[in-house]
Amino acid sequence: MFSCLIIGDSTGVGTAHAINQRLEQRCDVLAVERATAAQIMAWPKPTKNYGSCIFAMGSNDPPGERSAEKMMRIRSAMCFRRVIWLLPYGRGQAYTVSSVAARFGDETLDLRCFPTRDGIHPSRYSDVASALLR
């Protein structure tokens, strides 16, 4: 049985909505607008075992080692067979997130591949969902 979790900030909220419109068995969502890595670290850890997880975080955090350390703690506290990180539009934040993903051998999807109006959110989350569900 397929089980997935989407965790993170507003890009996670939008991505989850688009993915769950397409799946019969919906992904669980732990995402809120403007969430930072520090806030996500304080959330209760999921007790369910998920096969896949999409991490959508970093857009609301400054780039750099302190943010990377928080994201590494979040990632270390959870075990999944497959993890995909959404890389934020901001290149500094994207580098920070991608460095964490690389340390764990996780996959990434660069949001910069998708049109945006505000430089933070994709214009069409349906395009992001299509790329993730391939």
Spans of features found by a protein language model:
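Catalytic nucleophile-elbow at a beta strand-turn-alpha helix junction centered on a G-D-S/GDSL motif
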Residues: F2-H17
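Alpha-helical cap/lid subdomain in secreted, periplasmic
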Residues: R22, R26-C27, A35-R134
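Active-site bordering "gate/hinge" segments
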Residues: V32
